[in-house]
Every structure is written in C-alpha cells, then in structure tokens.
Amino acid sequence: MKTILICNQKGGVGKSMLCDEICYGLERDQVKFSLYDLDQQGSLTHEEKEVDNAAVAIVDTPGALQDDLTKWIEAADMIIVPTLMTRKDLAPLERMIKILQPFEGKKPILYVLNMYDRTNMTKDFYKWFDENYPECTTAILTRTTLLPQADACSMSIVDFAPRSTGAEHIKNIYAYIKTTLNIREGWR
C-alpha cells in the first residue's frame, strides 16, 4: 500500500480540499483506498474509511505541529505540502521545509502553491520560493471560486468545471501523484 501524507503546520491552506480531490481521482480510476482524517475539524467531503487490501492510503493532517507528525512523515511514500502564498504563510512553510529536509531525495515531496493568481504578491512569493528552495518540487493551484462551488455539490472540480484552469491544475497534481507512485487504474 502506498501512503500519501498531506501536511502543513498551518491551517486553512487547502489540505482537506487536496485530500478530497485525490480521493475523487482515485475513485475515477477505480483504485481502492483508505482515508485517515487526523484533523478533528471534519472538513473532508469524503468519509474516513479503512478498506481491506487498499492500494493507497491518504492521510489528512491538522494545521498544527504534532509530536506524531514525524512518524507519519517516516511512514509516508509521498508527502504533499499545500501552502498559500502570503507573508503569513512563510514562517510555517519554512518550518515544514526544515522538518522535511532529512527526507528530501528519499521520498517524493510536492509543495502545492495554492490560490495562485496574477498579483505581484503571488509572483514575488513564487520567485522567493524558487530562489530559496530550487530543489523543491512544486505545483500550482489557481485561485478560483469553482473549488468551493464543486465542494458544495460534493463533486470534484474536474467533474464540476472540467475545462477550468483549476480542474487542469488538479489533473496535473493527480497525474504527478499517479506517475510518481506508479498507481494504475483499477489497482486494488
């Protein structure tokens, strides 16, 4: 079983949304998965479940540093770190990068730069991240009202607004996960 850990010390950065979108992708591909929700806020659209012989386990974490986070990081086959691109997100992001540095190169770590838009602040953040952490693998997820609209309908943005930029970004993130972890359709 492949384990995908979605983590960041900061809340409100899109961990649960990404977790749900990965679940939708696995459902489309008919891949058996277990879902573990360590975040007590209950923000997931999908219900927590443990499935016998699951091919993938997805772990959604809370927005706070916990002692057992290191254990989850060690157990994960892939780590996804969503972050917003604001000044307030810099310190928590740098703490996460520091925590994950011992695992860099040993397991895939994807930093999802969430709510990307065309403002100078976003461009400056992206440039800062690229200059200071060029070794980090990143993906962009655009700022869009379609994600919460899709969530309100208990749908993936890929099904709700398939031609949108947000859907394309989610497809790219999911394709990276599938390729990196060698997840195949119908994998059980």
Named regions from a protein language model:
Residues P148-Y174:
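Inter-lobe coupling/hinge region of RecA-like P-loop helicase motors
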